Amino acid sequence: MTSYSFYCNTAAVGVFFEFRDYKKFIECTDEYKNIPNPLMASLKWLAQCLIFMGIFAVGGKLVPLEYCWSENFDKHSFPYRVVFYFVAAFPKRAFYYSPFSATTGAIIASGFGYNGIKTVKEKEVHQWDKVIGVYWYECETIISPVEVFRYWNY
């Protein structure tokens, strides 16, 4: 139980996963018997993390969110203000997407993110979606705020 509580990938950002899955991972049972090399899958998440870091670093300067609180912002039309706010807030959200992407990459690199094999178009594909910190695209395109709980840290 202590190893579950102090597993390094939970301490990073607190990505949620079940004890049952962790126990199967430690005991190398079920889908964890023969884990393939996770290098490429984890590097994809690292690349995503670095892209989000770049968006945060550069995007915040190009489209400053602070402009939304200036007196000049009220002079624009309502549709312009809505679109500007959404675009300007994305680099701030990328600040949070970045560590969750890095943690997901670390979990996949450890092998814990392996979810077995899925057949796609008569071809077997390894699935690395057992533990995902954030589905950023789904979070950006949801209709209801309640849906965030499905795509972030679950």
Model-derived regions, located:
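Long, well-ordered, tryptophan-enriched scaffold segments
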Residues: 35-64, 79, 83-88
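Transmembrane-helix bundle segments that line or gate the permeation/cavity pathway
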Residues: 1-22, 27, 60-64
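Membrane-interfacial segments
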Residues: 26-29, 59, 63, 67-71, ...
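Membrane-interfacial catalytic/cofactor-binding modules of polytopic membrane enzymes
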Residues: 1-5, 71-154
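Alpha-helical interaction elements in eukaryotic regulators
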Residues: 8, 15-18, 22, 39, ...
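Helix-loop boundary elements of multi-pass alpha-helical membrane proteins
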Residues: 22-46, 137-141, 145
